[in-house]
């Protein structure tokens, strides 16, 4: 996710945020203004979790004699004032005033209302949703390439929607293809299912499994690299793809520990201190007793951690003592996994930064 991409909820108005008047389907008086149950606390909860709110509504014939603008404005403005009084802010209110027979490009499920969001790259497609009570809302979501959620006061109310959105697994998938490597990586930070790792380098597979096991997440990784030359591109590009996937899965980083520290001791004394700060840096201290372990060059170990720090935005301090080269390298991957486990663990929705962003 780039800095400009955001998790956005595109929310229908009538029948979703407020009750749709059952007789004439027009919210044109204050007497008809009735909020859907629990919409206020749930929108507050979702907003605090980092979701941006955008209202998207079809209003048939708005501005015509059948639905004068002044009749629309009074209850609509009161609704917006009430939302604002509870700290609920909509970044945009997007309204199509046309009838279906006008064949406009902005009426849902057409994309006219949300065109700027799509063209300007504002949407994080993995964490954005359309919420509405009609099939046209679900069709809009499909046309946008995001997930649609069908609101229903009885079958799928606002608390149920909140549960679905806030419990969404932190999953990310990255495909990286270059002239040297073809990599497919998928991570699930909230699953501890058995990982599947195939890089073509047995010892490297074992090390990556240490990160996933001690990091407490599921990793599925396949690498097809130019191993007939050497291990450089496969190790480097794996680190870049894995770092990108981890960063993507963390989303806006709300609720994470951010910092990690681990100091396990076996034959080798390894130490890792890390900060998911989006300010990449590596300080690495190790003197390996051999040039290779298995089919992996030990000179690629610091390069792996440098690359993953760059891709994930880590400030990373990593060291190990003298010892058997296999145990030295393994201690580094283990200690990194243990520190990462602390840093990515989620507890609440607060952003762990006084700057308001990470």
Swiss-Prot record:
Which compartment or compartments is the protein found in?
Cytoplasm
Q: Which UniProt keywords apply?
A: Amino-acid biosynthesis, Cytoplasm, Histidine biosynthesis, Hydrolase, Lyase, Magnesium, Metal-binding, Multifunctional enzyme, Zinc
Domain of life of the source: Bacteria
Q: In which pathway does it act?
A: Amino-acid biosynthesis; L-histidine biosynthesis; L-histidine from 5-phospho-alpha-D-ribose 1-diphosphate: step 6/9; Amino-acid biosynthesis; L-histidine biosynthesis; L-histidine from 5-phospho-alpha-D-ribose 1-diphosphate: step 8/9
Q: Does the keyword Lyase apply?
A: yes
| Any one of the GO CC terms | cytoplasm
Provide the cofactor list for this protein.
Mg(2+); Zn(2+)
Q: Which PROSITE patterns match?
A: IGP_DEHYDRATASE_1 (PS00954)
Where are the active-site residues found?
Answer: 12 (nucleophile), 14 (proton donor)
Catalytic activity, per the record? D-erythro-1-(imidazol-4-yl)glycerol 3-phosphate = 3-(imidazol-4-yl)-2-oxopropyl phosphate + H2O; L-histidinol phosphate + H2O = L-histidinol + phosphate
- UniProt-recorded name of the protein: Histidine biosynthesis bifunctional protein HisB
Q: Which organism is it from?
A: Pseudoalteromonas atlantica (strain T6c / ATCC BAA-1087)
């Amino acid at each position: 996710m780039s800095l400009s991409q955001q998790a956005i909820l595109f929310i229908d108005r009538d029948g979703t945020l407020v009750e749709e008047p059952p007789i004439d389907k027009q919210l044109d008086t204050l007497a008809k203004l009735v909020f859907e149950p629990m919409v206020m606390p749930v929108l507050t909860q979702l907003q605090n979790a980092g979701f941006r709110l955008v209202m998207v509504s079809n209003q048939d014939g708005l501005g015509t004699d059948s639905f004068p603008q002044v009749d629309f404005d009074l209850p609509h403005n009161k609704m917006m004032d009430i939302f604002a009084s509870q700290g609920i802010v909509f970044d945009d209110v997007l309204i199509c005033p046309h009838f279906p027979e006008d064949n406009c490009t902005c009426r849902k499920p057409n994309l006219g209302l949300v065109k700027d969001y799509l063209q300007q790259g504002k949407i994080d497609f993995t964490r954005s949703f359309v919420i509405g009570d009609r099939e046209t809302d679900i069709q809009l979501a499909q046309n946008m390439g995001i997930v649609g959620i069908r609101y229903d006061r009885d079958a799928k109310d606002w608390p149920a929607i909140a549960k679905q959105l806030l419990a969404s697994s932190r999953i990310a998938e990255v495909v990286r293809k270059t002239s040297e490597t073809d990599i497919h990586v998928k991570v699930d930070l909230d699953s501890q299912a058995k990982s599947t790792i195939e890089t073509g380098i047995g010892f490297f597979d074992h090390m990556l499994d240490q990160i996933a096991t001690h990091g407490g997440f599921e990793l599925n990784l396949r690498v097809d690299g130019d191993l007939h030359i050497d291990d450089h591109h496969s190790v480097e590009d794996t680190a870049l793809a894995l770092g990108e996937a981890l960063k993507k899965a963390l989303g806006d980083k709300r609720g994470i520990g951010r910092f990690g520290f681990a100091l396990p001791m076996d034959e080798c004394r390894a130490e890792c201190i890390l900060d998911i700060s989006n300010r990449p840096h590596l300080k690495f201290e190790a003197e390996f007793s051999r040039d290779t372990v298995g089919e992996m060059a030990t000179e690629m170990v610091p390069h792996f951690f440098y690359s993953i720090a760059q891709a994930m935005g880590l400030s990373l301090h990593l060291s190990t003592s003298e010892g058997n080269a296999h145990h030295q390298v393994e201690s580094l991957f283990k200690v990194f996994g243990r520190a990462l486990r602390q840093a990515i663990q989620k507890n609440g929705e607060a952003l762990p930064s006084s700057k308001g962003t990470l």
